[in-house]
Amino acid sequence: MPAPILPLIEAAGRWPERGALVGLDLGTKTIGVAVSDPDRRLATGVETIQRKAFKADAARLLAICAERKVVGFVLGLPINMDGSEGPRAQSTRAFARNLAGLTDLPIGLWDERLSTAAVERELIGMDVSRAKRAEVIDTHAAIFILQGALDRLTTLRRSGQ
């Protein structure tokens, strides 16, 4: 049975109480990957996958999930500033559907609006060279996406929602 693909809050209801989550920043050429600790407090960068074919990309992602005992995915969904979904969001949803056919780990979609821009500003502020930024931006965007989702889930849990 394919994994459910849901908005983050609904996906959280399908994940076990404890266990690591993997955060993904999908690009056309790369996939930034971050993983949380089992208590879901901190996102840490794992790697940037150079995209090849879907099956190879998915095999690497699922290997990371097995290595890190991941219980669910947080996939950054690139929503337009007006709230609509453009071609990049459609491509992300297609990737999620394909991935869902290979795993039973619930997939949570999280609005990643401006995540790469925010990370790039931060790296520029840290005086990271353009070449080095290109190497690390996707992993850092995955960290940004996953940490934002973790923080939102923590806020909801604390408020009793």
Curated annotation (Swiss-Prot):
Any Gene Ontology CC annotation: cytosol
Record Pfam families: RuvX
Natural source organism: Bradyrhizobium sp. (strain ORS 278)
CDD domains: YqgF (cd16964)
Record's function text: Could be a nuclease involved in processing of the 5'-end of pre-16S rRNA.
Annotated family: Belongs to the YqgF nuclease family.
Family annotation (HAMAP family): Nuclease_YqgF (MF_00651)
Main location: cytoplasm
Name the UniProt record assigns to this protein: Putative pre-16S rRNA nuclease
Xref: SUPFAM superfamilies: Ribonuclease H-like (SSF53098)
